[in-house]
């Protein structure tokens, strides 16, 4: 059968990726690229949230940042939030409730439809996003100091080449990863 599991490849990432250094310029296994990209993303996000906590946002979580970006300056309904994040309306409602409880979001009647409630970022939510942007600038500068500004620029340029423009700033990672 074509869909049989190859026992030699099961857990290849776990077994082969345990800190084995690769020689400069040597070919690496195909699975390593997505894991390195994910690890780089995770490293940046974890450091972002450590710094956000130190700057007055101890309860902010990665999912909250995606949700606040999805709500945006113009606001969004729970249904719109769910669509933008790729999650159910119920999950979006829970996220909105949590953001409201933390003071990042408020609700107001939708001026175009009184039956709907519009989620809006509060000054506290805007502060979290503004601080996030500044922290990301600092983290990028650290990467540039570590590997050189040209290499960071080349990495960004290469990613812009292989990632379609329409996919570069998607906010639905939580829904995609979740299922």
Model regions and ranges:
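Exposed, interaction-prone assembly regions rather than primary DNA-binding/catalytic cores
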Residues: 153-179
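Residues within helix-turn-helix
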Residues: 78-79, 90, 97, 117
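Charged, amphipathic alpha-helical coiled-coil/dimerization segments
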Residues: 3, 20, 97-160
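N-terminal helix-turn-helix DNA-binding core of bacterial DNA-binding proteins
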Residues: 46-88, 102, 171-176
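Short amphipathic alpha-helical segments with heptad-repeat character
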Residues: 31-34, 38, 42, 72, ...
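N-terminal positioning helix adjacent to the helix-turn-helix/winged-helix DNA-binding module
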Residues: 29, 33, 62-64, 124, ...
């Amino acid at each position: 059968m074509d869909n049989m599991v190859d026992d030699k490849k099961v857990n290849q990432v776990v077994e082969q990726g345990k800190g084995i250094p690769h020689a400069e310029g040597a070919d690496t296994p195909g699975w390593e690229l997505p894991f390195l990209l994910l690890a780089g993303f995770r490293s940046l996000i974890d450091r972002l949230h450590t710094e956000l906590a130190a700057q007055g946002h101890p309860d902010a979580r990665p999912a909250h940042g995606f949700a606040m970006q999805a709500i945006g300056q113009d606001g969004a309904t729970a249904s719109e939030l769910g669509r933008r994040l790729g999650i159910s309306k119920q999950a979006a409602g829970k996220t909105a409730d949590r953001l409201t409880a933390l003071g990042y979001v408020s609700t107001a009647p939708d001026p175009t439809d009184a039956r709907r409630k519009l989620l809006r970022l509060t000054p506290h939510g805007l502060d979290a996003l503004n601080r996030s942007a500044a922290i990301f600038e600092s983290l990028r500068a650290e990467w540039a100091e570590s590997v050189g500004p040209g290499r960071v620029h080349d990495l960004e340029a290469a990613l812009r080449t292989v990632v379609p423009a329409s996919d570069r700033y998607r906010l639905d990672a939580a829904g995609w990863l979740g299922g």
